From Swiss-Prot:
The gene is prf1. Keywords: Cytoplasm, Protein biosynthesis. Its main location: cytoplasm. GO terms for molecular function: translation release factor activity, codon specific. Belongs to the eukaryotic release factor 1 family. Heterodimer of two subunits, one of which binds GTP. Pfam families: eRF1_1, eRF1_2, eRF1_3. InterPro entries: eFR1_2_sf, eRF1_1_Pelota, eRF1_1_sf, eRF1_2, eRF1_3, Peptide_chain-rel_aRF1, Peptide_chain-rel_eRF1/aRF1, Ribosomal_eL30-like_sf. GO terms for cellular component: cytoplasm. It is found in: Cytoplasm. Directs the termination of nascent peptide synthesis (translation) in response to the termination codons UAA, UAG and UGA. PANTHER family: PEPTIDE CHAIN RELEASE FACTOR SUBUNIT 1. It comes from Methanobrevibacter smithii (strain ATCC 35061 / DSM 861 / OCM 144 / PS). Coiled coil: none annotated. This is Peptide chain release factor subunit 1.
Length: 412
């Protein structure tokens, strides 16, 4: 996705998760996507048309709620002369808090992290989030090839987008029925032609894949043994060969074969993300057991090292639920930062000011993850958000409180 900060990405993912949990009673949640080049005046006209169309909705309550949502959208878009560079997204609708009659109008308006290319208007019982969810998908580039003796297809996979780079045909002759020396001679011709074809495939793969800045891995498929011969042979540049992560059997070649490779590699590609998480946690654990190792853990210790500029990579569990709050003294203005497990804990907190003894009042709040990510960006520290899908991820959360760091230098 476009270059955004770790904090912005975390907040965007958090917003999407919250929006995905919003459900309406009927098809009354309105989603609007406005590309940058779409005239706001045109959107306003379309909203007026939709307002008129909504009069045909049979359910009185749904009709009223949809019309209210459209009116809110019309009010909001009047505040814009033009859509921002990446476009504008609006989610508006009545969200129930409990039983009937508890609905409240909720409005979300923001610029997404990547450009919107298509105008959308949709009413449903949930917000339409697919275009935004696509933006946050991991979209590393993978090289793909399907090979047999007759043809080869070379492609890349980035997110859900497949790009066919090359399709080659071999001209390798089929089986020959002659016997004796003629048969042996013909077999040698076939083997030489097959070898030359594999050389040609390798040259094209080297040219196509070495030009890619971020090639995460290469997967090679095909219906016969040619793919194994190709992988074992000396046909690829060592940089490409070292990135082969799997070979898979397919029934087809060509574009159908590429699609089959993708389908059969879904688990492999998913495991690569998990392996990256495991790798960074294992690096932390390795530093932890060394004398004067470059490891730190626990909220207080990591925070201190982060502020000092000693943290190279910050490891945070995605399952951290704690909050970081700023409390302010109403008398002397003294501010103190406190970490709490939940909002209910903060509500019960009666902490006296360290200066004058007056009870502190909550001033601002954010999640502990947001707080740490913000500080990491200020100190140019890398941030790794670790899921609990692996044993290492669970260990980070349970044994180290979900907060750890790999240091730039040893802190005495």
């Amino acid at each position: 996705m476009a270059e955004v900060s770790s904090k912005e990405l975390y907040k965007f993912k958090k917003t999407l998760k919250e929006l995905s949990e919003k459900k309406g009673r009927g098809t009354e949640l309105v989603s609007v996507y406005i590309p940058h080049d779409k005239q706001i005046s045109d959107v306003g006209k379309q909203m007026r048309d939709e307002l008129g169309q909504s009069a045909n909705i049979k359910s009185k309550q749904t009709r009223k709620n949809v019309q209210s949502a459209i009116e809110v959208i019309m009010q909001r878009i009047r505040l814009f002369k033009a859509a921002p560079e990446n476009g504008l997204v609006l989610f508006v609708g009545m969200i129930p808090r409990g039983g009937p009659g508890t609905e409240k109008m909720e409005t979300y308006v923001f610029e997404p992290p990547e450009p919107i290319t298509t105008y959308w208007y949709q009413c449903n019982n949930e917000f339409f989030l697919e275009p935004l969810e696509y933006m946050i998908e991991e979209r590393e580039t993978y090289g793909l090839a399907v090979i047999d003796r007759k043809e080869a297809t070379i492609a890349t996979l980035r997110g859900k987008k497949v790009n066919i780079l090359n399709h080659l045909t071999s001209g390798v002759p089929g089986k020959h029925k002659a016997g004796g020396q003629s048969q042996r001679r013909f077999d040698r011709v076939i083997d030489l032609a097959a070898h030359e074809f594999k050389k040609r495939i390798g040259e094209h793969m080297n040219e196509d894949f070495l030009a890619l800045e971020e090639l995460e891995g290469v997967i090679i498929g095909g219906p016969g043994f040619t793919k194994e011969e190709f992988v074992k042979g000396d046909y690829l540049n060592y940089e490409i060969k070292d990135k082969i992560i799997a070979t898979v059997d397919t029934s087809y070649t060509g574009e159908f074969g590429i699609r089959e490779v993708i389908d059969k590699s879904a688990d492999i590609l998913n495991d690569l993300d998990v392996m990256q998480e495991k790798k960074v946690v294992q690096k932390f654990l390795h530093e932890l057991v060394k004398d004067k190792g470059l490891a730190s853990y626990g909220e207080r210790e990591v925070r201190t090292n982060l502020i000092m500029g000693a943290v190279d990579t910050l490891l945070l569990s995605e399952d951290l639920t704690a909050m970081r709050k700023v409390f302010k003294c109403p008398s002397c203005g003294n501010e103190e930062e406190i970490t709490v497990k939940s909002q209910s804990e903060a509500d019960k907190l009666e902490k006296p000011c360290s200066n004058c003894g007056e009870i502190l009042k909550e001033e601002s709040s954010q999640t502990l993850i947001e707080d740490f990510v913000e500080k990491a960006e200020e100190m140019n520290s890398e941030v790794e958000l670790i899921s609990t899908e692996t044993e290492e991820g669970m260990q980070l959360l349970r044994a180290f409180g979900g907060v750890a760091a790999i240091l730039r230098y040893h802190v005495g």
